[in-house]
Design a protein with these regions (language model features):
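N-terminal accessory segments
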Residues: 1-63
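Short, solvent-exposed loop/edge-beta patches enriched in aromatic
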Residues: 58-64, 90-95
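Conserved nucleotide-state-sensing and coupling region of NTP-binding domains
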Residues: 100-138
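Alpha-helix boundary/capping segments in eukaryotic regulatory proteins
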Residues: 74-80, 90-96, 101
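Contiguous, well-ordered alpha-helical segments that form the cores/surfaces of helical PPI scaffolds
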Residues: 52-56, 78-90
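Post-Walker A helix-loop "phosphate-sensing" segment adjacent to the P-loop in P-loop NTPases
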Residues: 87-96, 119-123
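Walker A/P-loop
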Residues: 61-85
């Protein structure tokens, strides 16, 4: 009986590992899934999913230019200025991204947020070969 229980436990562990690998693969292919994987507090709404579809098309170079118009406090900065750069660097560590803002302070804060995402355990699980070099953040 003991060997059957061990067999079932190993089977369950294997299934859980397979499930985790599938979740990770989805997060590598979709900015929406990336957001949900790396931030368990992120609340995805329909307008976030729609924006993510456009951002995915942008990262696949199906869209060359993308302008985002949404009311304040609807998640533009979180998706476009924080999550998207981290996602792009994970998929292409040699990418060049220029982040601009109306204030240097805001741009620096968003840059630190991107660094925090990229230094996170879950990010490194998705993109183990993507690392930041240089000054660490607190």
């Amino acid at each position: 009986m003991r060997s059957r229980e061990n067999f079932l436990l190993n089977d369950l562990r294997g299934l859980e590992q397979l499930r985790r690998e599938l979740v990770c693969e989805k997060a590598r292919r979709s900015i929406a899934e990336f957001c949900l994987f790396t931030d368990d507090r992120y609340q995805m709404n329909w307008h976030h999913r729609l924006l993510c579809e456009y951002l995915d098309a942008f990262t696949r170079k199906e869209i060359r230019r993308l302008m985002v118009f949404m009311p304040p406090r609807h998640g533009k900065s979180e998706l476009v200025s924080r999550k998207l750069p981290a996602y792009i660097f994970g998929r292409n560590p040699d990418a060049n991204i220029i982040a601009t803002s109306y204030s240097a302070d805001l741009a620096q804060r968003m840059n630190r947020d991107v660094q925090r995402i990229m230094d996170g355990r879950l990010y490194l699980e998705l993109f183990p070969d993507t690392r930041l070099y240089g000054k660490s953040i607190g």
